[in-house]
């Protein structure tokens, strides 16, 4: 009996069965990959996006795969909509939430001198304000679950300079620091907080830009761009009971880019 119980505990360390999760921006890209990863591992997932049509298309695919996913329309740059989202999540999951993945985000690439006040406000609201406010709103639900995990989807632009815009980099750097602060403050509530920082990930936009492709491959020791499921797997790991002593960390998923000192890949 003792051996059977030990085996069950070991199995549960690598499962999200019975857990609840909220993933913002889950209708495409990294967010969609995260939703599918968590659901595949047994979690009940709620996700949101601005585009209802895209959400419904995803729902049909998820239902066909047997995933338990609910959805709602939400623009995370809106404080009122964030509050309505969390009220909805609290109702669906009976006041308890195990996992929050603040994934929704956006970017505007311009020289710093060309940014407008509207650009600044929009990027801050979508990337940083939403991550802070949703974490704040989710705190009582995460605490009530007895074991909570927050993952902030940041970027390597929050760790090193990348030519994608100073405001975007500032929001992502702030998210990394937010994860550290919340990890320390909320550890007593058994809530862990980490940030994940992807480098360029394969998307149609990226794949159609040959110059960008060449530059990324030159600067990445592994010589290739990453795939969405190589990021979602880390997000899932950070939510496993097996990761119960990992908190306050900023983890790059970048094929070695951030430790490459911006060196171009040599021709051998």
From Swiss-Prot:
Keyword presence, Electron transport: no
Top-level taxon of origin: Eukaryota
Catalytic center residues: 168
Residues that, per the record, bind NADP(+): 22-46
Gene3D superfamilies: NAD(P)-binding Rossmann-like Domain
Keywords: NADP, Oxidoreductase
EC code(s) of this entry: 1.1.1.-
Binding site for substrate: 155
Keyword Transcription regulation part of the UniProt annotation: no
Major enzyme class: oxidoreductase
GO molecular function terms listed in the Swiss-Prot or TrEMBL record: oxidoreductase activity
Family of the protein in this entry: Belongs to the short-chain dehydrogenases/reductases (SDR) family. SDR65C subfamily.
Name assigned to this protein: Tropinone reductase homolog At2g29170
Lineage: Eukaryota, Viridiplantae, Streptophyta, Embryophyta, Tracheophyta
């Amino acid at each position: 009996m003792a051996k059977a119980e030990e085996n069950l505990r070991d199995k549960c360390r690598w499962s999200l069965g019975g857990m609840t999760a909220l993933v913002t921006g889950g209708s495409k890209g990294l967010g969609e990959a995260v939703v599918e990863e968590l659901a595949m591992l047994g979690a009940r997932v709620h996700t949101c996006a601005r585009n209802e049509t895209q959400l419904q298309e995803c729902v049909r695919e998820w239902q066909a795969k047997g995933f338990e996913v609910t959805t709602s329309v939400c623009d995370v740059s809106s404080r009122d909509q964030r509050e309505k989202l969390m009220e909805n999540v609290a109702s669906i999951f009976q006041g308890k939430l195990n996992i929050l993945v603040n994934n929704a985000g956006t970017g505007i690439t311009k020289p710093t001198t060309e940014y407008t006040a509207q650009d600044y406000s929009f990027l801050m609201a979508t990337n940083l304000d939403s991550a802070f406010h949703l974490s704040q709103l989710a705190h009582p639900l995460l605490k009530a679950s007895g074991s909570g995990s927050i993952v902030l989807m940041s970027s390597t632009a929050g760790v090193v300079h990348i030519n994608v815009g100073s405001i975007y980099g500032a929001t992502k750097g702030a998210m990394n620091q937010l994860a550290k602060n919340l990890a320390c403050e909320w550890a007593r509530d058994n809530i862990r907080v980490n940030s994940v920082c992807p480098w360029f990930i394969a998307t149609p936009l990226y794949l159609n830009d040959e110059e960008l492709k060449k530059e990324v491959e030159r600067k990445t020791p592994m010589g290739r761009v990453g795939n969405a499921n190589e990021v979602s797997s880390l997000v899932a790991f950070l939510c496993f009971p097996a990761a119960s002593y990992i908190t306050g960390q900023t983890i790059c998923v970048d094929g070695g880019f951030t430790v490459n000192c911006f060196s171009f890949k040599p021709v051998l």
